[in-house]
């Protein structure tokens, strides 16, 4: 179910609609969906360790759909950093990113080599546009004159959440080839 539907379902009080009647109504209307979800492989779906949806309900992440998801606002008192094992599982879905452990804080890290200093700033602008639309902001570093480095983690909890992987997946989809240095071909 989508994250938008869950808060509405949980906000219905028992006196308004009995749970059995609600389930039967949903089941009758969406038999195909219920049948399909009951047949899904556990290998293709992982429970998010963030548990950080607006409703407080757990979110489920099909590992292939990170870039289509939207970052959700953090409620620091209910949100916990994911374990290193959970982070390793999701890391497979964000090609090119590495896990870094900085003073017991897990972070996502990636580097690019750009053509020039100004191309690095252009790169940052493209990342900033995504970060603003997601409401989740990475640390951006321009090291030397052409090394772009990005670190992502959820600052409010001092660790990684699903939001960090969503942002990394969206950064991976950026069209930045025009900004990157071409690798020299061995002769």
UniProtKB/Swiss-Prot annotation:
GO terms for molecular function: 4-alpha-hydroxytetrahydrobiopterin dehydratase activity. One of its GO terms (biological process) is tetrahydrobiopterin biosynthetic process. Involved in tetrahydrobiopterin biosynthesis. Possesses pterin-4-alpha-carbinolamine dehydratase activity when expressed in a bacterial heterolgous system. Its EC number is 4.2.1.96. It is found in: Mitochondrion. This is Pterin-4-alpha-carbinolamine dehydratase 2, mitochondrial. Belongs to the pterin-4-alpha-carbinolamine dehydratase family. It holds the Pfam family Pterin_4a. Keywords: Lyase, Mitochondrion, Tetrahydrobiopterin biosynthesis, Transit peptide. It comes from the Eukaryota. CDD domains: PCD_DCoH_subfamily_a. It comes from Arabidopsis thaliana (Mouse-ear cress). It catalyses: (4aS,6R)-4a-hydroxy-L-erythro-5,6,7,8-tetrahydrobiopterin = (6R)-L-erythro-6,7-dihydrobiopterin + H2O. GO terms for cellular component: mitochondrion. Residues 1-33 form a transit peptide.
